[in-house]
Protein backbone atom coordinates (compact mmCIF):
# COMPACT_ATOMS: atom_id res chain seq x y z
CA UNK A 1 0.00 0.00 0.00
CA UNK A 2 2.84 2.33 0.86
CA UNK A 3 4.52 1.53 -2.45
CA UNK A 4 1.40 2.32 -4.46
CA UNK A 5 0.94 5.57 -2.58
CA UNK A 6 4.53 6.70 -3.28
CA UNK A 7 4.19 5.90 -7.01
CA UNK A 8 0.92 7.83 -7.33
CA UNK A 9 2.33 10.85 -5.51
CA UNK A 10 5.48 10.98 -7.66
CA UNK A 11 3.52 10.65 -10.89
CA UNK A 12 1.06 13.35 -9.82
CA UNK A 13 3.98 15.63 -8.84
CA UNK A 14 5.66 15.25 -12.23
CA UNK A 15 2.45 15.96 -14.15
CA UNK A 16 1.69 18.93 -11.98
CA UNK A 17 5.07 20.41 -12.88
CA UNK A 18 4.65 20.02 -16.68
CA UNK A 19 5.75 23.45 -17.97
CA UNK A 20 3.20 23.45 -20.74
CA UNK A 21 0.36 22.85 -18.45
CA UNK A 22 0.31 26.21 -16.69
CA UNK A 23 -1.37 29.40 -17.87
CA UNK A 24 1.45 31.63 -16.67
CA UNK A 25 4.14 30.18 -18.95
CA UNK A 26 4.51 29.35 -22.62
CA UNK A 27 6.87 27.36 -24.79
CA UNK A 28 8.21 28.80 -28.05
CA UNK A 29 10.17 26.57 -30.45
CA UNK A 30 12.01 27.57 -33.60
CA UNK A 31 12.33 25.11 -36.45
CA UNK A 32 12.81 24.57 -40.14
CA UNK A 33 11.12 22.79 -42.98
CA UNK A 34 11.56 19.01 -43.37
CA UNK A 35 10.19 16.33 -45.68
CA UNK A 36 9.50 12.66 -45.11
CA UNK A 37 11.84 11.56 -47.91
CA UNK A 38 14.68 13.90 -48.78
CA UNK A 39 17.33 13.76 -51.52
CA UNK A 40 20.92 12.66 -50.97
CA UNK A 41 23.65 14.99 -52.24
CA UNK A 42 27.43 15.22 -51.94
CA UNK A 43 29.30 17.92 -50.09
CA UNK A 44 32.96 18.53 -49.36
CA UNK A 45 32.66 16.84 -45.97
CA UNK A 46 29.99 14.19 -46.64
CA UNK A 47 29.47 11.74 -49.49
CA UNK A 48 25.78 11.52 -48.67
CA UNK A 49 23.80 14.16 -46.83
CA UNK A 50 20.03 14.47 -47.00
CA UNK A 51 18.46 17.76 -48.10
CA UNK A 52 14.84 18.77 -48.54
CA UNK A 53 15.20 19.47 -52.25
CA UNK A 54 17.80 19.11 -55.01
CA UNK A 55 18.08 19.71 -58.75
CA UNK A 56 19.63 17.27 -61.21
CA UNK A 57 22.52 18.89 -63.11
CA UNK A 58 23.33 16.14 -65.64
CA UNK A 59 21.26 15.75 -68.81
CA UNK A 60 21.34 12.01 -69.48
CA UNK A 61 18.74 11.58 -72.24
CA UNK A 62 18.13 13.02 -75.69
CA UNK A 63 14.95 13.65 -77.62
CA UNK A 64 15.95 11.01 -80.16
CA UNK A 65 15.57 13.49 -83.02
CA UNK A 66 17.61 16.38 -84.40
CA UNK A 67 15.87 19.75 -84.31
CA UNK A 68 16.18 21.94 -87.41
CA UNK A 69 15.86 25.17 -85.47
CA UNK A 70 17.62 27.55 -84.75
CA UNK A 71 20.37 25.95 -86.86
CA UNK A 72 20.23 25.09 -90.55
CA UNK A 73 20.59 21.33 -90.49
CA UNK A 74 21.30 19.67 -93.86
CA UNK A 75 20.49 15.97 -94.16
CA UNK A 76 23.15 14.33 -96.33
CA UNK A 77 20.93 11.26 -96.80
CA UNK A 78 23.00 8.79 -98.90
CA UNK A 79 25.68 11.36 -99.72
CA UNK A 80 28.92 12.08 -97.89
CA UNK A 81 30.13 15.67 -97.71
CA UNK A 82 33.22 14.90 -99.81
CA UNK A 83 31.10 13.25 -102.53
CA UNK A 84 28.85 16.31 -102.60
CA UNK A 85 31.90 18.58 -102.85
CA UNK A 86 33.51 16.57 -105.68
CA UNK A 87 30.27 16.58 -107.65
CA UNK A 88 29.19 12.94 -107.65
CA UNK A 89 26.47 12.82 -110.38
CA UNK A 90 24.02 11.19 -107.99
CA UNK A 91 24.30 14.03 -105.47
CA UNK A 92 24.16 17.17 -107.64
CA UNK A 93 21.31 18.45 -105.46
CA UNK A 94 23.82 19.35 -102.72
CA UNK A 95 26.20 21.42 -104.83
CA UNK A 96 24.90 24.85 -103.83
CA UNK A 97 23.52 24.07 -100.38
CA UNK A 98 24.36 25.96 -97.17
CA UNK A 99 24.30 24.59 -93.64
CA UNK A 100 25.18 25.13 -90.03
CA UNK A 101 25.38 21.39 -89.46
CA UNK A 102 25.77 18.74 -92.16
CA UNK A 103 24.41 15.36 -91.06
CA UNK A 104 26.20 12.35 -92.56
CA UNK A 105 24.32 9.07 -92.39
CA UNK A 106 25.82 5.64 -91.84
CA UNK A 107 24.10 4.59 -95.07
CA UNK A 108 26.02 7.18 -97.16
CA UNK A 109 28.16 5.78 -99.96
CA UNK A 110 30.17 6.91 -102.99
CA UNK A 111 28.64 6.21 -106.37
CA UNK A 112 31.31 7.35 -108.80
CA UNK A 113 34.89 6.42 -109.69
CA UNK A 114 36.59 4.91 -106.60
CA UNK A 115 38.88 7.37 -104.85
CA UNK A 116 40.73 8.08 -101.62
CA UNK A 117 41.67 11.28 -99.84
CA UNK A 118 45.04 10.99 -98.02
CA UNK A 119 44.03 13.80 -95.63
CA UNK A 120 40.32 13.03 -95.59
CA UNK A 121 39.53 14.23 -92.06
CA UNK A 122 41.18 17.61 -92.53
CA UNK A 123 39.45 18.25 -95.86
CA UNK A 124 36.10 17.13 -94.48
CA UNK A 125 36.45 19.38 -91.44
CA UNK A 126 37.63 22.32 -93.57
CA UNK A 127 34.68 22.11 -95.95
CA UNK A 128 32.20 21.49 -93.12
CA UNK A 129 33.32 24.58 -91.19
CA UNK A 130 32.86 26.69 -94.33
CA UNK A 131 29.14 25.89 -94.30
CA UNK A 132 28.73 26.00 -98.07
CA UNK A 133 29.71 24.28 -101.32
CA UNK A 134 29.71 27.54 -103.25
CA UNK A 135 31.82 26.87 -106.35
CA UNK A 136 33.26 29.28 -108.92
CA UNK A 137 34.40 27.89 -112.29
CA UNK A 138 37.62 29.25 -113.77
CA UNK A 139 38.97 29.20 -117.31
CA UNK A 140 41.91 26.81 -117.07
CA UNK A 141 43.59 26.22 -120.43
CA UNK A 142 44.67 22.64 -121.07
CA UNK A 143 46.40 22.51 -124.44
CA UNK A 144 47.16 19.31 -126.32
CA UNK A 145 45.10 16.93 -124.16
CA UNK A 146 41.58 15.54 -124.14
CA UNK A 147 39.33 16.95 -121.43
CA UNK A 148 36.14 15.76 -119.71
CA UNK A 149 37.09 12.12 -119.34
CA UNK A 150 34.40 9.82 -118.01
CA UNK A 151 33.88 6.31 -116.64
CA UNK A 152 31.17 3.68 -116.63
CA UNK A 153 31.60 3.62 -112.83
CA UNK A 154 30.23 7.16 -112.65
CA UNK A 155 27.16 7.56 -114.80
CA UNK A 156 25.06 10.68 -115.17
CA UNK A 157 21.79 9.44 -116.53
CA UNK A 158 22.61 6.84 -119.19
CA UNK A 159 25.99 8.30 -120.16
CA UNK A 160 29.46 7.76 -118.73
CA UNK A 161 30.45 10.74 -116.62
CA UNK A 162 32.76 11.93 -113.86
CA UNK A 163 32.90 14.24 -110.82
CA UNK A 164 31.52 17.58 -112.00
CA UNK A 165 34.10 19.63 -110.06
CA UNK A 166 37.06 17.76 -111.60
CA UNK A 167 38.40 17.48 -115.14
CA UNK A 168 39.95 14.16 -116.19
CA UNK A 169 42.68 14.88 -118.74
CA UNK A 170 43.89 12.13 -121.09
CA UNK A 171 46.11 11.90 -124.20
CA UNK A 172 45.07 13.47 -127.49
CA UNK A 173 46.21 11.86 -130.72
CA UNK A 174 48.76 9.72 -128.88
CA UNK A 175 50.31 12.78 -127.26
CA UNK A 176 50.32 14.14 -123.72
CA UNK A 177 52.47 17.27 -123.58
CA UNK A 178 53.80 18.74 -120.36
CA UNK A 179 51.19 21.04 -118.89
CA UNK A 180 52.08 24.28 -117.14
CA UNK A 181 49.15 26.36 -115.91
CA UNK A 182 49.04 29.28 -113.47
CA UNK A 183 46.01 30.84 -111.79
CA UNK A 184 46.48 33.93 -109.56
CA UNK A 185 44.22 34.78 -106.65
CA UNK A 186 43.35 38.44 -107.15
CA UNK A 187 40.44 38.34 -104.70
CA UNK A 188 40.44 39.12 -100.99
CA UNK A 189 39.46 35.64 -99.75
CA UNK A 190 41.01 32.19 -99.61
CA UNK A 191 40.34 29.77 -102.46
CA UNK A 192 40.19 26.00 -102.10
CA UNK A 193 41.28 24.01 -105.16
CA UNK A 194 40.54 20.29 -105.41
CA UNK A 195 42.68 18.19 -107.76
CA UNK A 196 43.89 14.62 -108.03
CA UNK A 197 46.02 11.98 -109.68
CA UNK A 198 44.93 8.78 -111.42
CA UNK A 199 46.51 5.44 -110.51
CA UNK A 200 45.91 3.04 -113.43
CA UNK A 201 45.59 -0.67 -112.71
CA UNK A 202 48.10 -1.78 -115.40
CA UNK A 203 51.01 -0.37 -117.40
CA UNK A 204 48.96 -0.89 -120.55
CA UNK A 205 46.18 1.34 -119.15
CA UNK A 206 48.81 3.92 -118.20
CA UNK A 207 50.25 4.26 -121.70
CA UNK A 208 46.82 4.02 -123.30
CA UNK A 209 45.54 7.00 -121.31
CA UNK A 210 48.66 9.11 -120.84
CA UNK A 211 51.27 7.81 -123.37
CA UNK A 212 54.15 8.12 -120.87
CA UNK A 213 55.09 5.06 -118.83
CA UNK A 214 54.78 7.16 -115.66
CA UNK A 215 53.25 10.56 -115.15
CA UNK A 216 53.80 13.20 -112.51
CA UNK A 217 51.75 16.00 -110.98
CA UNK A 218 53.20 19.01 -109.14
CA UNK A 219 50.99 21.68 -107.61
CA UNK A 220 52.63 24.72 -106.03
CA UNK A 221 51.93 28.06 -104.39
CA UNK A 222 54.32 30.54 -102.80
CA UNK A 223 53.80 28.72 -99.49
CA UNK A 224 53.66 25.05 -100.47
CA UNK A 225 54.44 22.41 -103.08
CA UNK A 226 53.16 18.87 -103.63
CA UNK A 227 54.58 16.40 -106.14
CA UNK A 228 52.67 13.14 -106.65
CA UNK A 229 53.69 10.15 -108.79
CA UNK A 230 51.06 7.53 -109.70
CA UNK A 231 51.21 4.05 -108.19
CA UNK A 232 50.40 1.70 -111.05
CA UNK A 233 48.94 -1.64 -110.02
CA UNK A 234 45.78 -3.66 -109.67
CA UNK A 235 43.51 -3.08 -106.67
CA UNK A 236 40.26 -4.68 -105.51
CA UNK A 237 37.47 -4.12 -107.99
CA UNK A 238 34.99 -1.42 -107.04
CA UNK A 239 32.11 -0.60 -109.37
CA UNK A 240 33.94 -2.34 -112.19
CA UNK A 241 37.24 -0.50 -111.64
CA UNK A 242 40.58 -1.66 -110.21
CA UNK A 243 42.23 1.74 -110.71
CA UNK A 244 42.00 4.56 -108.17
CA UNK A 245 42.06 8.32 -107.92
CA UNK A 246 43.78 10.14 -105.04
CA UNK A 247 42.22 13.50 -104.17
CA UNK A 248 44.38 16.39 -102.92
CA UNK A 249 43.63 19.97 -102.06
CA UNK A 250 45.44 23.31 -102.01
CA UNK A 251 44.46 26.63 -100.43
CA UNK A 252 45.54 29.74 -102.31
CA UNK A 253 45.72 32.91 -100.23
CA UNK A 254 44.89 36.38 -101.62
CA UNK A 255 47.83 37.60 -103.76
CA UNK A 256 49.21 34.07 -104.15
CA UNK A 257 49.38 32.00 -107.34
CA UNK A 258 48.36 28.42 -108.07
CA UNK A 259 50.82 26.61 -110.38
CA UNK A 260 50.09 23.18 -111.90
CA UNK A 261 52.74 21.14 -113.75
CA UNK A 262 52.05 17.66 -115.11
CA UNK A 263 53.10 15.24 -117.84
CA UNK A 264 50.31 12.75 -117.17
CA UNK A 265 47.71 11.31 -114.79
CA UNK A 266 46.37 14.75 -113.77
CA UNK A 267 42.82 15.11 -112.49
CA UNK A 268 42.55 18.87 -112.91
CA UNK A 269 40.41 21.40 -111.03
CA UNK A 270 37.62 23.24 -112.81
CA UNK A 271 37.55 26.13 -110.37
CA UNK A 272 37.63 26.87 -106.65
CA UNK A 273 35.47 26.76 -103.54
CA UNK A 274 35.11 30.06 -101.73
CA UNK A 275 36.33 29.55 -98.18
CA UNK A 276 34.38 31.03 -95.31
CA UNK A 277 35.13 31.10 -91.62
CA UNK A 278 32.28 30.21 -89.31
CA UNK A 279 30.82 27.87 -86.73
CA UNK A 280 29.47 25.33 -89.22
CA UNK A 281 30.31 21.68 -88.68
CA UNK A 282 29.53 18.09 -89.60
CA UNK A 283 28.18 15.19 -87.56
CA UNK A 284 27.55 11.52 -88.16
CA UNK A 285 24.11 10.54 -86.96
CA UNK A 286 21.15 8.36 -87.88
CA UNK A 287 18.69 10.32 -85.76
CA UNK A 288 15.75 11.72 -87.76
CA UNK A 289 15.52 15.46 -88.40
CA UNK A 290 12.34 17.07 -87.12
CA UNK A 291 10.76 20.50 -86.91
CA UNK A 292 11.55 21.62 -83.38
CA UNK A 293 13.83 23.99 -81.48
CA UNK A 294 17.00 23.03 -79.63
CA UNK A 295 20.33 24.81 -79.24
CA UNK A 296 22.29 21.61 -78.59
CA UNK A 297 22.63 18.69 -81.00
CA UNK A 298 24.34 15.34 -80.43
CA UNK A 299 24.48 12.24 -82.66
CA UNK A 300 21.83 10.73 -80.37
CA UNK A 301 19.51 13.67 -81.01
CA UNK A 302 18.94 17.15 -79.64
CA UNK A 303 19.13 17.71 -75.90
CA UNK A 304 17.99 20.58 -73.66
CA UNK A 305 20.73 22.93 -72.52
CA UNK A 306 19.11 24.00 -69.26
CA UNK A 307 21.58 21.87 -67.31
CA UNK A 308 25.31 22.55 -67.01
CA UNK A 309 26.42 18.95 -67.72
CA UNK A 310 25.47 16.06 -69.98
CA UNK A 311 26.63 12.51 -70.53
CA UNK A 312 24.63 11.75 -73.68
CA UNK A 313 27.53 12.03 -76.14
CA UNK A 314 31.01 13.52 -76.34
CA UNK A 315 30.28 14.91 -79.81
CA UNK A 316 28.07 18.00 -79.74
CA UNK A 317 27.15 21.02 -81.79
CA UNK A 318 25.80 24.34 -80.57
CA UNK A 319 25.35 25.76 -77.11
CA UNK A 320 25.70 22.56 -75.13
CA UNK A 321 26.36 21.40 -71.58
CA UNK A 322 29.79 20.05 -70.82
CA UNK A 323 30.23 16.30 -71.22
CA UNK A 324 31.05 14.48 -67.97
CA UNK A 325 31.32 10.83 -67.00
CA UNK A 326 28.83 11.03 -64.14
CA UNK A 327 25.25 10.08 -64.90
CA UNK A 328 23.97 12.21 -62.03
CA UNK A 329 25.11 15.25 -60.06
CA UNK A 330 22.56 16.83 -57.74
CA UNK A 331 22.68 20.46 -56.64
CA UNK A 332 21.11 21.13 -53.25
CA UNK A 333 18.35 23.73 -53.54
CA UNK A 334 16.97 23.18 -50.07
CA UNK A 335 18.23 22.87 -46.53
CA UNK A 336 19.54 19.97 -44.51
CA UNK A 337 16.67 17.51 -44.01
CA UNK A 338 15.98 16.08 -40.56
CA UNK A 339 12.63 14.23 -40.73
CA UNK A 340 10.25 14.98 -37.90
CA UNK A 341 10.08 12.46 -35.07
CA UNK A 342 6.60 11.07 -34.64
CA UNK A 343 6.96 10.57 -30.85
CA UNK A 344 8.83 13.09 -28.70
CA UNK A 345 8.88 11.77 -25.16
CA UNK A 346 6.02 10.52 -23.03
CA UNK A 347 4.41 13.97 -22.78
CA UNK A 348 4.40 14.74 -26.53
CA UNK A 349 6.10 18.12 -26.08
CA UNK A 350 6.97 20.22 -29.11
CA UNK A 351 10.61 20.19 -30.22
CA UNK A 352 12.89 22.72 -31.88
CA UNK A 353 15.34 22.57 -34.78
CA UNK A 354 18.14 21.03 -32.69
CA UNK A 355 16.10 17.82 -32.34
CA UNK A 356 14.49 17.59 -35.79
CA UNK A 357 12.78 19.46 -38.60
CA UNK A 358 9.07 20.05 -39.05
CA UNK A 359 7.09 18.42 -41.82
CA UNK A 360 4.08 20.09 -43.36
CA UNK A 361 5.34 23.70 -43.25
CA UNK A 362 3.66 25.46 -46.16
CA UNK A 363 4.32 29.10 -45.33
CA UNK A 364 8.12 29.14 -45.19
CA UNK A 365 11.34 27.26 -44.61
CA UNK A 366 11.72 28.59 -41.07
CA UNK A 367 9.08 29.17 -38.46
CA UNK A 368 7.74 29.02 -34.91
CA UNK A 369 5.73 26.48 -32.95
CA UNK A 370 4.35 27.50 -29.60
CA UNK A 371 2.25 26.21 -26.73
CA UNK A 372 0.39 28.64 -24.52
CA UNK A 373 -2.97 29.00 -22.83
CA UNK A 374 -4.62 29.29 -26.26
CA UNK A 375 -3.26 25.98 -27.55
CA UNK A 376 -0.51 24.79 -29.89
CA UNK A 377 0.05 26.68 -33.15
CA UNK A 378 2.63 27.06 -35.93
CA UNK A 379 3.61 29.98 -38.19
CA UNK A 380 6.34 30.56 -40.77
CA UNK A 381 8.98 33.28 -40.75
CA UNK A 382 9.00 34.81 -44.22
CA UNK A 383 11.99 37.11 -43.73
CA UNK A 384 14.53 34.40 -42.93
CA UNK A 385 12.96 32.12 -45.55
CA UNK A 386 13.32 34.79 -48.24
CA UNK A 387 16.92 35.49 -47.20
CA UNK A 388 17.82 31.82 -47.75
CA UNK A 389 15.88 31.54 -51.01
CA UNK A 390 17.51 34.68 -52.42
CA UNK A 391 20.95 33.17 -51.88
CA UNK A 392 20.01 29.77 -53.32
CA UNK A 393 18.17 31.18 -56.34
CA UNK A 394 20.60 31.77 -59.14
CA UNK A 395 22.95 28.97 -58.08
CA UNK A 396 21.87 26.85 -61.03
CA UNK A 397 22.21 29.79 -63.42
CA UNK A 398 25.68 30.54 -62.09
CA UNK A 399 26.79 26.94 -62.57
CA UNK A 400 25.40 26.95 -66.13
CA UNK A 401 27.21 30.21 -66.89
CA UNK A 402 30.46 28.68 -65.70
CA UNK A 403 30.10 25.61 -67.92
CA UNK A 404 27.94 26.35 -70.98
CA UNK A 405 29.79 27.83 -73.92
CA UNK A 406 28.92 28.33 -77.54
CA UNK A 407 31.21 25.77 -79.08
CA UNK A 408 31.08 22.54 -81.01
CA UNK A 409 33.08 19.42 -80.31
CA UNK A 410 33.55 17.69 -83.66
CA UNK A 411 34.30 14.05 -84.15
CA UNK A 412 37.82 13.28 -85.26
CA UNK A 413 39.02 10.79 -87.87
CA UNK A 414 42.47 9.52 -88.66
CA UNK A 415 43.81 7.21 -91.32
CA UNK A 416 45.53 3.99 -90.37
CA UNK A 417 48.98 5.52 -90.83
CA UNK A 418 48.07 8.11 -88.21
CA UNK A 419 47.25 5.53 -85.56
CA UNK A 420 49.68 6.93 -83.02
CA UNK A 421 48.29 10.42 -83.53
CA UNK A 422 44.80 9.02 -83.02
CA UNK A 423 45.89 7.32 -79.80
CA UNK A 424 47.41 10.57 -78.57
CA UNK A 425 44.28 12.53 -79.48
CA UNK A 426 42.10 9.99 -77.70
CA UNK A 427 44.32 10.21 -74.62
CA UNK A 428 44.08 14.02 -74.63
CA UNK A 429 40.29 13.92 -75.03
CA UNK A 430 39.88 11.32 -72.28
CA UNK A 431 42.09 13.39 -69.99
CA UNK A 432 39.99 16.49 -70.66
CA UNK A 433 36.82 14.56 -69.88
CA UNK A 434 38.34 13.18 -66.67
CA UNK A 435 39.35 16.69 -65.65
CA UNK A 436 35.94 18.16 -66.39
CA UNK A 437 34.21 15.31 -64.58
CA UNK A 438 36.36 15.91 -61.49
CA UNK A 439 35.84 19.68 -61.69
CA UNK A 440 32.08 19.21 -62.05
CA UNK A 441 31.88 16.99 -58.98
CA UNK A 442 34.04 19.38 -56.97
CA UNK A 443 32.03 22.42 -58.08
CA UNK A 444 28.72 20.80 -57.12
CA UNK A 445 30.10 19.60 -53.77
CA UNK A 446 31.30 23.14 -52.96
CA UNK A 447 27.95 24.66 -53.90
CA UNK A 448 26.09 22.05 -51.84
CA UNK A 449 28.29 22.73 -48.83
CA UNK A 450 27.63 26.44 -49.19
CA UNK A 451 23.87 25.90 -49.48
CA UNK A 452 23.69 23.76 -46.34
CA UNK A 453 25.92 26.14 -44.39
CA UNK A 454 23.90 29.22 -45.34
CA UNK A 455 20.54 27.59 -44.53
CA UNK A 456 21.92 26.50 -41.16
CA UNK A 457 23.21 30.04 -40.64
CA UNK A 458 19.77 31.55 -41.32
CA UNK A 459 18.27 29.20 -38.73
CA UNK A 460 20.88 30.27 -36.17
CA UNK A 461 20.30 33.95 -37.02
CA UNK A 462 16.58 33.58 -36.33
CA UNK A 463 17.28 31.76 -33.05
CA UNK A 464 19.74 34.44 -31.86
CA UNK A 465 17.34 37.20 -32.88
CA UNK A 466 14.62 35.59 -30.73
CA UNK A 467 17.03 35.08 -27.82
CA UNK A 468 18.01 38.78 -27.87
CA UNK A 469 14.35 39.80 -27.74
CA UNK A 470 13.34 37.54 -24.86
CA UNK A 471 16.44 38.12 -22.70
CA UNK A 472 15.84 37.07 -19.07
CA UNK A 473 12.10 36.63 -19.68
CA UNK A 474 12.74 33.15 -21.08
CA UNK A 475 15.14 30.25 -20.72
CA UNK A 476 16.87 28.36 -23.54
CA UNK A 477 15.74 24.74 -23.17
CA UNK A 478 18.66 23.43 -25.26
CA UNK A 479 16.59 21.87 -28.03
CA UNK A 480 15.77 24.95 -30.08
CA UNK A 481 12.97 26.02 -27.73
CA UNK A 482 12.47 28.76 -25.14
CA UNK A 483 10.45 28.48 -21.95
CA UNK A 484 8.75 31.86 -21.49
CA UNK A 485 8.19 32.73 -17.81
CA UNK A 486 5.18 34.95 -18.30
CA UNK A 487 1.75 34.63 -19.79
CA UNK A 488 2.23 34.95 -23.57
CA UNK A 489 -0.92 34.79 -25.66
CA UNK A 490 -1.02 34.70 -29.47
CA UNK A 491 -0.60 38.48 -29.72
CA UNK A 492 2.51 38.23 -27.56
CA UNK A 493 3.89 35.43 -29.74
CA UNK A 494 3.18 37.50 -32.85
CA UNK A 495 5.19 40.40 -31.42
CA UNK A 496 8.15 38.04 -30.95
CA UNK A 497 7.81 36.86 -34.55
CA UNK A 498 7.67 40.35 -36.07
CA UNK A 499 10.36 41.81 -33.82
CA UNK A 500 8.17 44.22 -31.80
CA UNK A 501 8.33 42.30 -28.50
CA UNK A 502 9.09 44.56 -25.49
CA UNK A 503 10.70 42.48 -22.76
CA UNK A 504 10.39 45.32 -20.20
CA UNK A 505 6.61 44.95 -20.16
CA UNK A 506 6.83 41.32 -19.03
CA UNK A 507 10.03 41.46 -16.98
CA UNK A 508 8.49 41.67 -13.49
CA UNK A 509 5.99 38.91 -14.20
CA UNK A 510 8.70 36.70 -15.68
CA UNK A 511 11.03 37.18 -12.71
CA UNK A 512 8.23 36.43 -10.24
CA UNK A 513 7.16 33.29 -12.08
CA UNK A 514 10.73 32.13 -12.48
CA UNK A 515 11.36 32.26 -8.69
CA UNK A 516 8.07 30.54 -7.90
CA UNK A 517 8.61 27.75 -10.39
CA UNK A 518 12.28 27.20 -9.60
CA UNK A 519 11.49 25.68 -6.23
CA UNK A 520 9.51 22.79 -7.60
CA UNK A 521 10.17 22.74 -11.33
CA UNK A 522 11.58 19.67 -12.91
CA UNK A 523 12.95 19.94 -16.37
CA UNK A 524 11.24 17.72 -18.89
CA UNK A 525 14.37 15.64 -19.28
CA UNK A 526 14.09 14.33 -15.65
CA UNK A 527 10.44 13.27 -15.71
CA UNK A 528 11.13 9.93 -17.28
CA UNK A 529 13.95 9.33 -14.79
CA UNK A 530 11.61 9.93 -11.83
CA UNK A 531 9.03 7.57 -13.24
CA UNK A 532 11.63 4.84 -13.68
CA UNK A 533 13.04 5.45 -10.18
CA UNK A 534 9.58 5.29 -8.62
CA UNK A 535 8.85 2.09 -10.53
CA UNK A 536 12.14 0.55 -9.35
CA UNK A 537 11.46 1.52 -5.72
CA UNK A 538 7.97 0.03 -5.91
CA UNK A 539 9.32 -3.24 -7.29
CA UNK A 540 11.97 -3.34 -4.56
CA UNK A 541 9.44 -2.77 -1.79
CA UNK A 542 7.13 -5.47 -3.20
CA UNK A 543 10.05 -7.92 -3.23
CA UNK A 544 10.92 -7.00 0.40
CA UNK A 545 7.31 -7.52 1.54
CA UNK A 546 7.10 -10.86 -0.31
CA UNK A 547 10.40 -12.05 1.18
CA UNK A 548 9.30 -10.99 4.68
CA UNK A 549 6.04 -12.91 4.29
CA UNK A 550 7.90 -16.06 3.25
CA UNK A 551 10.28 -15.81 6.22
CA UNK A 552 7.37 -15.24 8.64
CA UNK A 553 5.48 -18.24 7.22
CA UNK A 554 8.55 -20.45 7.56
CA UNK A 555 9.00 -19.36 11.17
CA UNK A 556 5.37 -20.19 12.08
CA UNK A 557 5.61 -23.57 10.42
CA UNK A 558 3.15 -22.78 7.68
CA UNK A 559 5.87 -23.27 5.08
CA UNK A 560 8.69 -25.80 5.25
CA UNK A 561 11.92 -25.37 3.39
CA UNK A 562 14.12 -28.45 3.04
CA UNK A 563 17.68 -28.02 1.85
CA UNK A 564 19.23 -31.27 0.60
CA UNK A 565 22.96 -31.75 0.02
Swiss-Prot record:
Membrane topology note: Single-pass type I membrane protein
Signal peptide start-end: 1-16
UniProt key word Translocase: no
S-palmitoyl cysteine lipid attachment residues: 554, 561, 564
Cellular compartments per GO CC: host cell plasma membrane; membrane; viral envelope; virion membrane
Domain of life: Viruses
Protein name: Hemagglutinin
Membrane-side (Extracellular) residue stretches: 17-529
Task performed by this protein: Binds to sialic acid-containing receptors on the cell surface, bringing about the attachment of the virus particle to the cell. This attachment induces virion internalization of about two third of the virus particles through clathrin-dependent endocytosis and about one third through a clathrin- and caveolin-independent pathway. Plays a major role in the determination of host range restriction and virulence. Class I viral fusion protein.
Disulfide bonding pattern of the chain: 29-481, 67-292, 112-154, 296-320, 488-492
Record key words, sorted: Clathrin- and caveolin-independent endocytosis of virus by host, Clathrin-mediated endocytosis of virus by host, Disulfide bond, Fusion of virus membrane with host endosomal membrane, Fusion of virus membrane with host membrane, Glycoprotein, Hemagglutinin, Host cell membrane, Host membrane, Host-virus interaction, Lipoprotein, Membrane, Palmitate, Signal, Transmembrane, Transmembrane helix, Viral attachment to host cell, Viral envelope protein, Viral penetration into host cytoplasm, Virion, Virus endocytosis by host, Virus entry into host cell
Keyword Transmembrane: yes
InterPro entries hit by this protein: Capsid_hemagglutn, Hemagglutn_HA1_a/b_dom_sf, Hemagglutn_influenz_A, Hemagglutn_influenz_A/B
Organism (species): Influenza A virus (strain A/Equine/Miami/1/1963 H3N8)
Entry similarity comment: Belongs to the influenza viruses hemagglutinin family.
Subunit: Homotrimer of disulfide-linked HA1-HA2.
Pfam families referenced in this protein's UniProt entry, alphabetically: Hemagglutinin
Species classification: Viruses, Riboviria, Orthornavirae, Negarnaviricota, Polyploviricotina
Swiss-Prot/TrEMBL site (Cleavage) positions: 344-345
Molecular function terms from GO: host cell surface receptor binding
Note: Major glycoprotein, comprises over 80% of the envelope proteins present in virus particle.
Amino acid sequence: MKTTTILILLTHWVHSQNPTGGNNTATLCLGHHAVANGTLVKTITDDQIEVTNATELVQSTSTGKICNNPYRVLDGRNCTLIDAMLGDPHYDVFQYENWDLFIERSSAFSNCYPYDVPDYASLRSLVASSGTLEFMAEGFTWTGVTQNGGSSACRRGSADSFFSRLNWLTQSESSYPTLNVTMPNNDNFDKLYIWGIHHPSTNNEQTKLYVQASGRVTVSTKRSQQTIIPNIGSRPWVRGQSGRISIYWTIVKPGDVLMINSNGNLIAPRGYFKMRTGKSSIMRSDAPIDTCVSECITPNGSIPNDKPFQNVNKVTYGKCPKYVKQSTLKLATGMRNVPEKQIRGIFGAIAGFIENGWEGMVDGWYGFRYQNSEGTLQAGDLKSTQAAIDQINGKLNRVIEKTNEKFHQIEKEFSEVEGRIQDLEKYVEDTKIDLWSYNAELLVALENQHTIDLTDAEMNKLFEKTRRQLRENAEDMGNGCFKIYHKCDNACIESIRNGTYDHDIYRDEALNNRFQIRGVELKSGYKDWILWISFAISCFLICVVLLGFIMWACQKGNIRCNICI
